[in-house]
Amino acid sequence: MASNSGHRDTRLLHGARTRSYGSLVQTTYSPAQIRKLEHQVQPGDTLQGLALRYGVSMEQIKRANRLYTNDSIFLKKSLYIPATAGQSDLSDDQNSQEGSETEGSPVKQPEKGEKQKSRHHVVQKDEMSPVDFMSRLDTNIRVSKRAAVKKLREGESFATEESTPGGAPGYQGNRTPSRQNSPQTQQRSLLGPVPLTITTRASTIRDHEDEIFKL
């Protein structure tokens, strides 16, 4: 009984071994089984994604590469991933499968005829042939000539309407009724200018003026 109590006291005195930062931890894997895989850092890589991809913890990756923050992986071109032999074989198989998929699905190259068609189509959109340019220029000149002739004809018709004696219906109200209904005006327009004639009254008045001048 005493021996059991003494053994228990010694266990309490020793206590459990506390772990602190930097202390060594025993693992079930030997150094021969742990391998370091080299991973080329890509623009979209994250520390969490790499840990899930290779089946390791983020602390192991940071410890193997001496990283202090999660965002400092882009400071290096490549990272070392600690992995066991089974994990390394699995990652090699995944890389080989990805390579075979890329090799098995060749990129379809466009045919020569399609290239020529697309190039010809682009040239037609960007540039215009001289024949098309001249035909378009002729069309524009023809349209402008037609518009000019139409304007000239409209001006001539308007001038002839103003020069006619009757005039347009809208201008009849502006004319004086004496010019429209005077028979003397119509007679003068038909016979022409009337010669000057000396009447007897005018001759007597002139003779009377001559007598007064003599006196």
Swiss-Prot record:
Disulfide bridges in this chain: none
InterPro entries (UniProt xref): LYSM1-4, LysM_dom, LysM_dom_sf
Biased composition (Polar residues): 86-103, 173-189
SMART domains found in the cross-reference section: LysM
Family annotation (Pfam families): LysM
PROSITE patterns for the chain: LYSM
Domain LysM per the UniProt entry, residue ranges: 37-81
Disordered: region residues: 86-133, 148-203
Origin superkingdom: Eukaryota
Designated name of the protein: LysM and putative peptidoglycan-binding domain-containing protein 1
